[in-house]
Curated annotation (Swiss-Prot):
Oligomeric and partner information: Interacts with replication protein 1a.
Protein name: RNA-directed RNA polymerase 2a
Organism: Pelargonium zonate spot virus (isolate Tomato/Italy/1982) (PZSV)
Catalytic reaction annotation: RNA(n) + a ribonucleoside 5'-triphosphate = RNA(n+1) + diphosphate
UniProt xrefs under SUPFAM superfamilies: DNA/RNA polymerases
Similarity-based family: Belongs to the ssRNA positive-strand viruses RNA-directed RNA polymerase family.
């Protein structure tokens, strides 16, 4: 055996007994534990530990359970006690205080700086690491660099199911598991911002410039006095049969009662339902029904359309078997809210009330300076009739959605979202724009609609009854004193409007295109979008020749439905992004009451909800939005940056949002005049 010297020991050349090494370091031999000492020597010699002292000093410090000196060159921002399998989970409360330091491909060591936070000694912790290192399988790398990309990465959807008792619970609220993430940042080296935030330089002038670039004819459009011109001029309209009486509604608009928008994006003024305005709207929305279709056998064609509908969309009719029970539950729930003193009387279901919408839908066409926008009309039953039919159609719609093929999405009811686990990149898109949708529907649409309702679970007597009072109806406007007859056309405000429009759109679409070529199909009223991986084949001429519809196939096709673009993230998940032009056209409303801030605050809440996820867009998603915007509007997508910044800035707080609207001083002056009139100013008695 070689002679023992302290220099040989330090150099590792000495191979004597372990207790001799222990004694040479000046440690007490009475405390000697051979197993523990050998384990410490192996740890130091293996190179797993990082320390800035000599080998013998490290052995002495580890034996005395003292802290090793840190290496000044290695900066560790945050250090936390080691977490072993026996450690109590309640010891470590903050994820941001621990960090894994990777030293090699095989080994991952957790740097330990505070041993009082855990129950194990340093020797026990190191022994656990050696046992894990001795296993045959390599240790997986620990990745804690979880960068926050978007709001949806905080949660993971576990499941989603329909709740039979209360459909409101099923509004896409599944159980979620929070994903705990953290960011490691050195406090000594502040992070410099190379690129400013999009909301830093937002102002009304730059936003108005972006709107003027995309909508050049909308910036200087002002129709404040257009309705006065209509009321004071001669009106020539042609009707086959219409009844008029003296109306008491006048175009007396108090402009000072409403907020005035600061953005000029082509928003129309509030329309008043005078008799002339009602006649213009009826002429546009109900009269002049297009006759584009050829002569067809209505009975045979309606049966073929109904069969094609079922084979294309419905995969399981079991959910609609119990629809009657659910209808009964809805009716009982509604019946409990009826006043027991409610007067029961008969109603003629063929009679509808009529009114015009005070809001005019903004348009993106560059024709506002040439053609005046016509308001839409609403044809509806009374509250009692709608309350009687709504439970039946609501129950049927809920069960109908459950029976649809997984490729079909109707963003309404229990599934009121367009978020999907579906990648829309590198696809072919088909968007069909159906104009004059309501008044173009005739006997054929009513017949195949009735047969579809019977096949998906609605009782035959109820379906026949509902369709019977659509064959011929009598519509009257009690304010404008206008009444006329109407047949077959869609009633725009009854209990079956959205569901019926969706069924008609789906039925016509399935008859014109083979639905097996599509991977996803989205329908909402008269809007439709189909996505395919191969070039789309079909016959769009059937929309005109068979169904009497004016159909326009959007070219180039983009993923756009319900005034929203569809984009995909890096993981292939699809979600909706609001159309920026449509959003800022809504901010030009001229019918927000200025009596108090409640009405304006409601507009702010709605805008904030729609823009909630816009600030979390990644650059990858913004580039998609720019491309789709360019394809749809034939405009440069660079203005998306201005829109994104404005969305974030004006949705931050109500104070920023309020700068988009101004209030005139006329209401304050009127209130002051009223106060002076009621209580005139008088000199004080002392004078």
């Amino acid at each position: 055996m070689a002679a023992f010297t302290f220099e040989n020991f330090l150099s590792g050349a000495y191979t004597g007994l372990p207790i001799d090494k222990f004694r040479a370091l000046g440690l007490n031999t009475e405390d000697y534990d051979e197993q523990r000492w050998e384990m410490l020597v192996k740890c130091v010699d293996s190179g797993l530990m990082q320390f800035s002292c000599s080998r013998d000093e490290a052995l002495v410090l580890l034996w005395n359970e003292e802290e090793l000196p840190k290496d000044d060159d290695d900066e560790v921002p945050y250090e936390v006690p080691c977490w072993t399998p026996d450690t109590d989970a309640t010891v470590i409360d903050d994820v941001s205080e621990w960090l894994a330091e990777k030293t090699s491909v095989r080994d991952t060591v957790v740097v330990c700086s505070d041993y009082d936070a855990v129950s194990e000694t340093p020797v026990e912790v190191l022994s656990v690491e050696l046992e894990e290192d001795s296993e045959e399988d390599t240790i997986a790398d620990v990745c804690l660099d979880a960068r926050r990309k978007s709001f949806r990465d905080y949660f993971t959807i576990v499941e989603e199911e329909f709740v039979e008792e209360d459909p409101l619970i099923s509004l896409n609220d599944g159980n979620v598991c929070p994903v705990r993430t953290h960011e490691v940042t050195s406090l000594e080296k502040p992070v410099m911002l190379d690129v400013g935030r999009r909301c830093d330089r937002v102002n009304l002038e730059s936003l108005q410039g972006a709107i003027n670039m995309n909508l050049p004819s909308h910036a200087y459009f002002d129709d404040t006095w257009h309705q006065y011109f209509v009321e004071g001029s001669k009106l020539d309209v042609d009707f086959d049969n219409i009844r008029l009486r003296q109306s008491e509604v006048f175009c007396d608009r108090d402009l000072d009662r409403y907020y005035q928008p600061e953005l000029f994006a082509g928003a129309s003024s509030r329309r008043i339902g005078t008799q002339k305005e009602a006649l213009v709207a009826i002429r546009k929305r109900n009269a002049d029904v297009p006759e584009l279709a050829d002569s067809v056998d209505v009975e045979r064609l309606s049966e073929s359309v109904a069969k094609k509908f079922l084979s294309s969309y419905v995969c399981d009719l079991k959910p609609v078997v119990g629809v009657m029970e659910k209808m009964r539950a809805y009716h009982q729930k509604w019946g409990d809210k009826i006043d027991p003193m409610f007067l029961l009387k008969e109603h003629n279901l063929q009679r509808y009330e009529h009114m015009i919408k005070t809001d005019v839908k903004p348009t993106v066409a560059h024709s506002m300076h040439v053609e005046r926008a016509i308001p839409a009309t609403i044809t509806f039953h009374g509250k009692s009739i709608c309350a009687g039919f709504s439970p039946s159609f609501t129950a049927l719609f809920d069960e109908f959605q459950k029976s649809l093929d997984e490729r079909v999405v109707i963003p309404s009811g229990p599934i009121s979202t367009i978020e999907m686990d579906f990648d829309i990149r590198n696809k072919y898109y088909l968007e069909v724009d159906l104009s004059k949708f309501d008044k173009s529907q005739g006997l054929l649409h009513l017949e195949f609609q009735r047969k579809i309702l019977c096949k998906i679970g609605l009782p035959a007597h109820l379906a026949n009854w509902w369709c019977d009072f659509h064959y011929k109806s009598f519509i009257s406007d009690p304010r404008a004193k206008v009444s006329f007859n109407c047949s077959f056309q869609r009633r725009t405000g009854d209990a079956f409007t959205f569901f019926g429009n969706t069924l008609v759109t789906m039925a016509m679409f399935s008859f014109c295109y083979d639905t097996r070529q599509f991977e996803k199909m989205l329908f909402a009223g008269d809007d439709s979008l189909a996505i395919s991986s191969s070039p789309i084949v079909g016959c769009s001429d059937y929309f005109v020749s068979l169904f009497n519809m004016e159909a326009k196939i959007m070219d180039p096709g983009v993923p756009y439905i319900c005034s929203k673009f569809l984009v995909s993230d890096e993981l292939g998940r699809c979600f909706s992004a609001p159309d920026p032009i449509r959003e800022f056209q809504r901010l030009g409303k001229k019918k927000i009451s200025a009596d108090n801030d409640d009405a304006l605050f409601e507009q702010y809440v709605g805008f904030k909800d729609r823009m909630s996820h816009m600030r979390n867009f990644s650059e990858y998603e913004i580039q998609q939005l720019k491309i789709f915007f360019n394809l749809k509007y034939k405009q440069s997508g660079e203005v998306i940056e201005d829109y994104m910044g404005a969305c974030m800035f004006y949705s931050d707080n109500f104070k920023n949002f309020k700068t988009l609207f101004t209030k005139t001083c006329a209401p304050l002056v009127a209130a002051l005049n009223k106060r002076v009139k009621d209580k005139p100013f008088r000199l004080p008695p002392s004078l």
